[in-house]
Every structure is written in structure tokens, then in C-alpha cells.
Amino acid sequence: MTSLTNTIGPDVPGPALTTAGGDVPDYFALLKPRVMVLVIFTALVGMVVSQGHVQPAIGAISLLAIAVGAGASGCLNMWWDADIDAVMSRTATRPIPSGRITSEEALGFGLFLSVASVVVLGLAANLLAAALLAFTIVFYAVVYSMWLKRATAQNIVIGGAAGALPPVIGQAVVTGSIGIESLILFAIIFIWTPPHFWALALIKADEYARAGIPMMPNVAGPASTRRQIVWYSLLLAPLGLVPVALGFGGLVYAVVGLVGGLGMVAFSIRVLRNPEGDAERRAAMGMFGFSILYLFALFSALLAEQSFGLFRPVLG
């Protein structure tokens, strides 16, 4: 386990937030902006499928608070993981291991944004939404980052709950409660997470092993990982169509869900059938890339149907 005060690389002198030396972009990078975009997107879908109404200004402030909360947890994750980030090629250039920001600065920044995002969401929306955001931050930054990630090959499975919560928070903003719609969206993201990340883990197995992270390919072996990718994809395909059965996914969503679900299964089988060499890498990267497209298309279909009058019921 990394030390609470671990610093990788030289400290960066001067003020924490200035425009000199690229400090502002570095602090922004700590927030994992690509993850923040996904969080905003899935939280927004959680809002629009809810049976309720929220003032646009309140909705915008709430989305910003949710995004900042997600960024804060990402910042705390980078602070804790600075030692393993330094030995992995895809993370070695992050602000802390590269020495552009100190561990202490990142910790203070992450804690400040964590508290601020929860307080703002509580004031703008309601206490349930704020409590869910606080839980998400703690679960990702503490339970996943400080414990699960380095302790078990099920780290992605259990830790995936944090990434699946934004739609639930979004619905709580609108209705002050948790409904079946957001719980189904939670389940879809939760089941989507393992095959998505394990596809990447198959390619990066050596780096994860060098960093001491017990990812599934390093613990159960590549063959078992490939089989589990197929099983999760087989579970995800029908789960993705549940919104249609419950009446909040229409015809457009049904088509996207059916085609996308079959695609997930097809790509997972391709991973299973290509266990070696360049074919393995191409299959795993194909699975990784298609899984991103699948989730984006699925949630985009819901957003389009609910926001632009495209909803056409399939059942009933």
C-alpha cells in the first residue's frame, strides 16, 4: 500500500494554481476530464428518464457539482496511485508521477473539491443527491482506490459501482428519490464495466503485473478472463433491453440495444477465439472500443427519445 505522503518525482515550486508552467491544465488533468464527460452524460440521462421536472438552472448546477465530485474522486485516486502510475506507460505522464504537481497539492485539491461538490449539490438539489455523491466519492477514492484495486481481482467488478451511480444521482436530483429507471441504468453500467476493462487488461497484463495490481488476467489467467468477458456480455445484451420492457425505452432505443447487445456478444466471442499474438491484441482492442460505442449509443438513444420527441413505445 502506498504511503499517505508518497511523492513521485520532484516537487513543483510556486503557487498551486497559476497559468505559468502549465499548472492549470495539470490540475485539470487530475480530474480525469474524459471520465467527467461520461459522468455528466450518464447523470443527464438519469435526469431525463425520471418522472419529474427540475428547473434548468438547478439541473445545470447539479450536473456541474456531480462532474466536479467525480473529478475530485479521480484526483484522490491519482494521489493514492502515484506510485503505480509511475511504472505504467499509459499513466506515467500524469501530473504527479511526472513531477508537475506534488502529492500534497493533489490531496488538498481533491479534498477541497470533494467537499465543495457535495455541499453545492445539497444546496442546489437535495440531501439525497448530495449523500449519493458523497458515497460515490468515498467508495471510489477509499474503498476502490485504497483497498479493492490492490487487494482482489474483483476490483473492477465491485469498484464499478462507483462509475454506475451517476444516473441514480441524476434521478435523485429531479425526484428526490431513487426509482427503477436509474437502478436499471446503474445495472447496465455495472455489468458493462468488467468486459470493458478486462479487454484492456488482457493487453496491459504485463504492466499491471509490474505495478502489482491483481487484474483478472494476472490472477485467473487470460483464458478465464476471456470466458468471463463472454459471460458478462451475454448478461449485458438482454439487460440492455430492460428499459424497453419497463416502458421508458422506445423503438429507437430497442433497435440500438438489440444491435449493440449482439455486437457486444460477437466481439466477446472474437476475444475468446483469438487467444494469442497480434490477433489477441486486435480482438481485445476491438472489444474495448466497441464497448465504449455501445454504452454511448445506448444512453444517447434514451436521451434522444426523451428530449426530442422520438419516443415510440414498443410494448403496449
Curated annotation (Swiss-Prot):
Other information: Carbon 2 of the heme B porphyrin ring is defined according to the Fischer nomenclature.
Statement: the UniProt record of this protein carries the keyword Membrane: yes
One CC-aspect GO term: plasma membrane
Principal location: membrane
Protein name listed in UniProt: Protoheme IX farnesyltransferase
GO MF annotation list: protoheme IX farnesyltransferase activity
Keywords linked to the UniProt accession: Cell inner membrane, Cell membrane, Heme biosynthesis, Membrane, Transferase, Transmembrane, Transmembrane helix
Gene: ctaB
Membrane topology: Multi-pass membrane protein
Catalysed reaction, written as an equation: heme b + (2E,6E)-farnesyl diphosphate + H2O = Fe(II)-heme o + diphosphate
Function field: Converts heme B (protoheme IX) to heme O by substitution of the vinyl group on carbon 2 of heme B porphyrin ring with a hydroxyethyl farnesyl side group.
Compartments where located: Cell inner membrane
Known pathway: Porphyrin-containing compound metabolism; heme O biosynthesis; heme O from protoheme: step 1/1
Membership in a protein family: Belongs to the UbiA prenyltransferase family. Protoheme IX farnesyltransferase subfamily.
